[in-house]
């Protein structure tokens, strides 16, 4: 039986023929709907931004933190195009990239160990499982400590552990670009209400962040462990954000809060990942974590009407939730 959803309307049931495959997946609780556009001809002509808004809605849609589109470039390389719940396109998504890496790996799409996003190449590979039965993938993310995405300091300089006076007179932020812009601040304790207020405030400061920004607070729990919470540009507070966890781990390494070159556990409200920052002539941080496929299904989207059905429940989510519970008890 297929579910038919009109945007802003209640669920209705119809028996219809689905047009393309969808996969519900997540990385560390950061959940997505994924569409392989390279083989799903039924998706041709669908407006990706409108589809992302409809699908991501947790009341009238499937519910997700965005949509991952698997695409193929003319030179044969495959890429991830990620759209936020508000329909905007993100340059990069670390949790989403791991999910795409898994699908690409299983379907033989990965060329020279590379996937693309936002015009950049990212090395990806299957990694040692973080727990039994949990598919785990790694992506190496180059880090820039200067970027035109930040208008409050000269792009040739670094902004690490400094107060942005015109934004918040207390928190010491580090500004990093991972293909998408991030500001992160170390705190004694992550306060979600404070994070929400900061996230709402930062959306109004295009004078400081012309392209918007992802904002994170992180707390150092030991030399090898931090906890991160993020207000994502285009999504709000999520259970986790892969590039934000990477940015936080990188900032902590650059500031000497954690040791560069060592494996750091990065916990979040959705679970945990691992990061390792390499600092040399350039800065790269390796992000490792789960790529969980919750279910496979079929869908169509025409005239603003989303229809979908689940065809296979994988059972992987049960394994992830058991792992998540174990983390909570540590």
Name these PLM-found stretches.
Residues 123-127, 133-137, 152, 156, ...:
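Feature of Fe-S/electron-transfer and energy-metabolism proteins
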Residues 125, 140, 163-165, 276:
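Generic structural detector for well-ordered beta-strands
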Residues 136-138, 142-144:
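Membrane helix-loop-helix hairpins that form the core translocation module of multi-pass transporters
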Residues 146-148, 152-171:
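Active-site glycine-rich loop that binds ribose-phosphate moieties when present
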Residues 162-192:
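Internal active-site segments that recognize and position negatively charged phosphoryl groups
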